[in-house]
Amino acid sequence: MAVTASMVKELREKTGAGMMDCKKALVEVDGDMEKAIDYLREKGIAKAEKKADRVAAEGLASVVTEGNKAVILEVNSETDFVAKNENFQALVTELAEHILAEEPADVEAALAQPFKGGSETVQDHINTAIAKIGEKLSLRRFTVVEKEDADVFGSYLHMGGRIGVLTVIGSSSDQELAKDIAMHVAAINPTYVSRDEVTKDVVDRERDVLKQQALNEGKPENIVEKMVEGRLSKFFEQVCLLDQPFVKDGDQKVGKYVKSKQASVKSFVRYEVGEGIEKREDNFAEEVMSQVKK
């Protein structure tokens, strides 16, 4: 498979490795992106897979709860300035309340629903806001979560909605605990609640990479397995909420802290505005020149 410049660029964004290292990795694995990431990690060139940090959109994440239901959603705008606009913030709240009440299957279904039982659809309502605010606005995603009577919701919005987190804490009515765990999730960004949620494929892949790393470091075969298990524990600490040092008390793990409160973490959802969408990057000099020529 031919290795293209766009493939090299994508691998650089995902790993932070140099251009030539990325090209060599892709050539070695015949263009397979996942294998190229593992190749770079095994060689010690990329410490870990990372997503491109560039953010494509501005906007807000928000959480609304009502009884045993809650919704977390992300609504995008073109600029951070509009994200602070009162009309935009009101739109975000209206959309959250609509989704919580109607529980559409997905974004497409939500946009087609009548808004508040009227003649206009949710998309029509967004279009009205676009005309008023003067920027493209879009409902990007949402998750509706339900809990049992004995559970409690927690929510946390960082930087006014740049990051939004919704947690469900089991066997507890401790709202402060639920919010603290949401705050931790916002700050540390775990992928899973516990090790039980990590699939065998993910663990096997990580174990293979760690083993190859140790062998490439020249470690003796007889101690490689022990090293791998130790490093695998570090991996779980990076991705599993309950294994992480609690952000408000680094001397104890989240799991131990929650257990001390006779509670459990059932689930969490974390939205960071614009994650996974590449933002258009304008050349500043060209932008200035374009204004001068007008």
UniProtKB/Swiss-Prot annotation:
> What cellular-component terms does GO give this entry?
cytoplasm
Could you tell me one molecular function GO term of this UniProt entry?
translation elongation factor activity
Where does the record place it?
Cytoplasm
Keywords of the record, alphabetical order, are: Cytoplasm, Elongation factor, Protein biosynthesis
The keyword Protein biosynthesis is annotated on this UniProt entry: yes
Q: Does the keyword Lipid biosynthesis apply?
A: no
Looking up CDD domains in the UniProt record yields: UBA_EF-Ts
Matching entries from InterPro entries are given as: EF-Ts_dimer_sf, Transl_elong_EFTs/EF1B, Transl_elong_EFTs/EF1B_dimer, Transl_elong_Ts_CS, UBA-like_sf
Chain segments carrying region Involved in Mg(2+) ion dislocation from EF-Tu: 79-82
Q: Known PROSITE patterns for this protein?
A: EF_TS_1 (PS01126), EF_TS_2 (PS01127)
Indicate the family of this protein. Belongs to the EF-Ts family.
Q: What role does it play?
A: Associates with the EF-Tu.GDP complex and induces the exchange of GDP to GTP. It remains bound to the aminoacyl-tRNA.EF-Tu.GTP complex up to the GTP hydrolysis stage on the ribosome.
Q: What is this protein called?
A: Elongation factor Ts
Lineage, top ranks:
Bacteria, Bacillati, Bacillota, Bacilli, Bacillales
